[in-house]
From Swiss-Prot:
Protein name: Sulfite reductase [NADPH] hemoprotein beta-component
UniProt record, GO biological process: cysteine biosynthetic process; hydrogen sulfide biosynthetic process; sulfate assimilation
UniProt source species: Cronobacter sakazakii (strain ATCC BAA-894)
Catalytic activity: hydrogen sulfide + 3 NADP(+) + 3 H2O = sulfite + 3 NADPH + 4 H(+)
Residues annotated for siroheme binding in this entry: 483
Family assignment from sequence similarity: Belongs to the nitrite and sulfite reductase 4Fe-4S domain family.
C-alpha cells in the first residue's frame, strides 16, 4: 500500500450476484440446453440470460417496437446478437460466403455488422436459429466462444497488409494468445455442437471456476499504427522489430474506456507501460496478467471490476511485480516505439510481397444491400473469385488482402459496381459509431443511425473553414460503456438521452490521450454550433500539422486529462 494507492490486494465484502451465477453455472452450462426447447418465450430465462454471453451472445429486442408490443400485451421481440471469435480479424472467402448466406437466410435484419474489435456480429438471431448459427460457424472452422462477458475477448491485431512478414508474425501471436486464454470448459461443445459429455471434471487453470471479475481485452499492436486503440484494452503487446523481424513486445496494462454517467468512481484510463519482454515469455506473461487480475480484481462491484481499477487500487508497481513473480521474468526497460496514426489506408496498397491489398471503407461496418449501394452482394461477388483473404479492421472496414496483379482489375470493377469504392471525405473515413438503437439494450441515444447525416453536416463545417481535406477523429457512442471508443477520439459524443450527448474534446490523433467533457447533455444543433466555432478557430490558429485535439489543448479550450483516476471528472 502507498499514499496514492491505498487499496488492499483483494476487495472483501458481499460478492456481486454475477459471481453466484458463475459459481452455480456448472462451468457455464446453466440450463441453456433445456432453455432452447422452451417455445413459450423468444428469450432465455433466469441465469441463462447472462450465461449465453460466455457463448458469444447477448439477448436483445427491437426497441423501435417495444412500446407497441407492450401495448398489445406481447413480450418484447427477443432476438440474440451473436459475435464471432476471429483473432486478428482474418478470414477466408469461403468463410465469408458461409456467414453471408446464414445472415441472409436466418437473421431478422439480414446484415453482417463489422465491429471495431475486428470481428462480425449477427443481429436479430431468433432463438430457434441460435444453435444452427453456432453449428454453421463450427463447420467453417469458426466459433463464438468467449467473445462476451468475463473472459479474454476477441484478440485484436494491427491490420498492416504492407509489412507482410511482420504482420504475419504478429497475427500468429494474436492467435496464440486467443487460444491460450480460452476457457477450457466443454460447455460450448456440448450445448452447441452436440459433442459427448465426458465423465471428467472441468477445470479452468487460467480463468478459474468463476472466470474473471469482468470483461478483459487484449491487443497485439504493430507500430506506427495504433488502429487497434491499445489504450482501450486491458493487456497490450506492442511489437518490437529488428530488421523487419519480430523480437519481442512492450507490455502495457490497464487501459479501458467504460464509465457510468455521474459515477465518479468510474473513469476512462490509458494503459500503463510495464516493460519489454522477449518473445519466449509472451504466453507466460499474458497468463500472469490474467491470473493476477483474476485473483485481485474487484468481485463485489462490477462497476469497479476491470483491470484499470485493480491497477489504481493496488498501484501499477505492485501489480507489475506480481506479474513478474508469477511469470518468472523481469521486465526490461520499454523499447522505443511511436505511433503516427490509427486510420485505415482506404484504397489499393502494394505489399512488400508484391501482392495488392484493397481497403474498403464500410460506413459503421454495416454490410447490407442498401438501395443505392448493394455492399453485401458486392462482397459476395468478390469472395467468389478472391484467392487471398478478407481482413476485418479495428476501424470497422474490410481489406481484400493478397490480390495478385492479374485479379486486381476484376476485383476493382466488382467493388466499384456495388458502391464499395465510392469516394468519401477524410472526415467520414475517420468517424465511427457503435450500434446503439434499435438493438442495443443499453443505448441512451442514437449512434449508428445518427452518424451518416451528422457527418454530412460536419463535412459542411469543414468545407466552410477551408478544411475539406482535413479530418478530426470523431466517434459517437450511444451510452457511456464506450463501444464506439469515443473516449479516445479527438471529438467524442457520448449518448445521455434521446437526441442528447456529452461532448468530449482533447484526445489526439494517435489515440494516446483521453478527451475531457466539454459540454454536457446537449442537442445535435448545439453540438454543431460548438464544432463550427472550434473548427473555425482551428483553421485560423493552428500550427503546421497540428491536429484538432492537440489544438484544443494548446489553445486552452480544454485541459488535458493527465491522471484519469484523479482528474477525469474535474
Amino acid at each position: 500500500m502507498s499514499e496514492k494507492y491505498p487499496g488492499p490486494l483483494v476487495v472483501e465484502g458481499k460478492l456481486s450476484d454475477a459471481e453466484r451465477m458463475k459459481r452455480e453455472s456448472n462451468f457455464l452450462r446453466g440450463t441453456i440446453a433445456e432453455d432452447l426447447h422452451d417455445g413459450l418465450t423468444g428469450g432465455f430465462n433466469g441465469d441463462n440470460f447472462l450465461l449465453i454471453r460466455f457463448h458469444g451472445m447477448y439477448q436483445q429486442d427491437d426497441r423501435d417496437i417495444r412500446a407497441e408490443r407492450a401495448a398489445q400485451k406481447l413480450e418484447p421481440r427477443h432476438a440474440m446478437m451473436l459475435r464471432c471469435r476471429l483473432p486478428g480479424g482474418i478470414m477466408t472467402p469461403q468463410q465469408w460466403l458461409a456467414i453471408d448466406k446464414f445472415a441472409e437466410e436466418n437473421t431478422i435484419y439480414g446484415s453482417i455488422r463489422l465491429t471495431n474489435r475486428q470481428t462480425f456480429q449477427y443481429h436479430g438471431l431468433l432463438k430457434k436459429n441460435v444453435k444452427p448459427a453456432h453449428q454453421m460457424l463450427h463447420s467453417v472452422g469458426l466459433d463464438a466462444l468467449a467473445t462476451a462477458n468475463d473472459m479474454n475477448r476477441n484478440v485484436l491485431c494491427t491490420s498492416n497488409p504492407v509489412e507482410s512478414q511482420l504482420h504475419a508474425e504478429a497475427y500468429e501471436w494474436a492467435k496464440k494468445l486467443s487460444e491460450h486464454l480460452l476457457p477450457r470448459t466443454r460447455a460450448y461443445a456440448e450445448i452447441w455442437l452436440d459433442q459427448e459429455k465426458v465423465a471428467t471434471t472441468d477445470e479452468e487453470p487460467i480463468l478459474g471456476a468463476t472466470y474473471l471479475p469482468r470483461k478483459f481485452k487484449t491487443t497485439v499492436v504493430v507500430p506506427p499504427q495504433n488502429d487497434v486503440d491499445l489504450h482501450a484494452n486491458d493487456m497490450n503487446f506492442v511489437a518490437i522489430a529488428e530488421n523487419g523481424k519480430l523480437v519481442g513486445f512492450n507490455l502495457l496494462v490497464g487501459g479501458g474506456l467504460s464509465i457510468e454517467h455521474g459515477n465518479k468512481k468510474t473513469y476512462a484510463r490509458t494503459a500503463t507501460e510495464f516493460g519489454y519482454i522477449p518473445l519466449e515469455h509472451t504466453l507466460a506473461v499474458a497468463e500472469a496478467v490474467v491470473t493476477t487480475q483474476r485473483d485481485w480484481g474487484n468481485r463485489t462491484d462490477r462497476k469497479n471490476a476491470k483491470t484499470k481499477y485493480t491497477l489504481e487500487r493496488v498501484g501499477p508497481d505492485v501489480f507489475k511485480a506480481e506479474v513478474e513473480r508469477r511469470a518468472g521474468v523481469t521486465f526490461e526497460p520499454v523499447r522505443p516505439y511511436e505511433f503516427t496514426g490509427r486510420g485505415d489506408r482506404i484504397g489499393w496498397v502494394k505489399g512488400i510481397d508484391d501482392k495488392w491489398h484493397l481497403t474498403l471503407f464500410i460506413e459503421n461496418g454495416r454490410i447490407l444491400d442498401f438501395p443505392d449501394k448493394p455492399l453485401k452482394t458486392g462482397l459476395k461477388e468478390i469472395a467468389r473469385i478472391h484467392k487471398g483473404d478478407f481482413r476485418l479492421t479495428a476501424n470497422q472496414n474490410l481489406i481484400v488482402a493478397g490480390v495478385p496483379e492479374g485479379d486486381k482489375a476484376k476485383i476493382e470493377q466488382i467493388a466499384r459496381a456495388h458502391g464499395l469504392m465510392a469516394g468519401v471525405t477524410p472526415q467520414r473515413e475517420n468517424s465511427m459509431a457503435c450500434v446503439s438503437f434499435p438493438t442495443c439494450p443499453l443505448a441512451m441515444a442514437e449512434a449508428e443511425r445518427f452518424l451518416p447525416q451528422f457527418i454530412d453536416k460536419v463535412d459542411g463545417i469543414m468545407a466552410k473553414h477551408g478544411l475539406a481535406e482535413e479530418h478530426i477523429v470523431l466517434r459517437v457512442t450511444g451510452c457511456p460503456n464506450g463501444c464506439g471508443r469515443a473516449m479516445l477520439a479527438e471529438l467524442g459524443l457520448v449518448g445521455k438521452a434521446p437526441g442528447r450527448y456529452n461532448l468530449h474534446l482533447g484526445g489526439n490523433r494517435i489515440g494516446t490521450r483521453i478527451p475531457r467533457m466539454y459540454r454536457e447533455n446537449i442537442t445535435e444543433s448545439e453540438i454543431l454550433d460548438n464544432i463550427d466555432e472550434l473548427v473555425g478557430r482551428w483553421a485560423q490558429e493552428r500550427e503546421p500539422g497540428e491536429g484538432f485535439g492537440d489544438f484544443t489543448v494548446r489553445a486552452g479550450i480544454i485541459r488535458p486529462v493527465l491522471d484519469p483516476a484523479r482528474d477525469f471528472w474535474e
